[in-house]
């Protein structure tokens, strides 16, 4: 994972970005020739979605774009939980606003099947 010189004599940090001139990412270097001098082009390279950044004549890097935040399954529940105070009660102590738990009914144990 360390930085090693790429074909242009620059250092490639393969852990954070994909240097298109790096020998490790040689199949991707064809994309750099197609893109040319584009400023920021969305691309999918070996399953990673990112932006191709080429600020100047330097080699083109693809930095992965952050994934969008996960939306809650039920949008109304986040408002309900946001209004509740964040006081943690000791174990075994219930809040007065909490609904009572249903009574547990013991079921008869079944004998071993034959």
UniProtKB/Swiss-Prot annotation:
Sequence segments annotated as region (Hydrophobic): 6-22, 33-53
Keywords: Host cell membrane, Host cytoplasm, Host cytoskeleton, Host endoplasmic reticulum, Host membrane, Host-virus interaction, Inhibition of host innate immune response by virus, Lipoprotein, Membrane, Phosphoprotein, Viral immunoevasion, Virion
Motif, PTAP/PSAP motif: chain positions: 96-99
GO CC, one annotated term: membrane
Region of interest (Homodimerization, and interaction with host AMBP/bikunin), ranges: 72-114
Biological processes, Gene Ontology terms: symbiont-mediated suppression of host innate immune response
One Pfam family of this chain: HEV_ORF1
Region of interest: Interaction with host SRC, HCK, FYN, PIK3R3 and GRB2: 95-104
InterPro entries: HEV_Orf2
Subcellular localization(s) per the UniProt record: Host endoplasmic reticulum membrane; Host cytoplasm, Host cytoskeleton; Virion; Host cell membrane
Region annotation (Disordered) ranges: 91-114
Predominant cellular place of this UniProt entry's protein: host cell
Residues annotated with Phosphoserine modification: 71
Subunit structure: Forms homooligomers. Interacts with host SRC, HCK, FYN, PIK3R3 and GRB2 (via SH3 domain); binding does not activate the kinases. Interacts with host AMBP/bikunin and AMBP/alpha-1-microglobulin peptides. Interacts with host HPX/hemopexin. Interacts (when phosphorylated) with capsid protein ORF2. Interacts with host TSG101; this interaction plays a role in viral release from the host cell. Interacts with host SIRPA; this interaction down-regulates the phosphorylation of host IRF3.
Record's comment describing the protein's domains: The PSAP motif is necessary for the release of membrane-wrapped virions from infected cells.
Protein name stated in the entry: Protein ORF3
Provenance organism: Hepatitis E virus genotype 1 (isolate Human/Myanmar/HEVNE8L)
């Amino acid at each position: 994972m360390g930085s090693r010189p790429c074909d242009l004599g620059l250092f490639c940090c393969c852990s954070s970005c994909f240097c298109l001139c790096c020998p490790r990412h040689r199949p991707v270097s064809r994309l750099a020739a197609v893109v040319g001098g584009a400023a920021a082009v969305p691309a999918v390279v070996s399953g990673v979605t990112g932006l191709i950044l080429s600020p100047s004549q330097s080699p083109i890097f693809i930095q992965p774009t952050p994934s969008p935040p996960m939306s809650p399954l039920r949008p109304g529940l986040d408002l309900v939980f946001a209004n509740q105070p964040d006081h943690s009660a000791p174990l075994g102590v219930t809040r007065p606003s909490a609904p009572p738990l249903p009574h547990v009914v013991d079921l008869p144990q079944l004998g071993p099947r034959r």
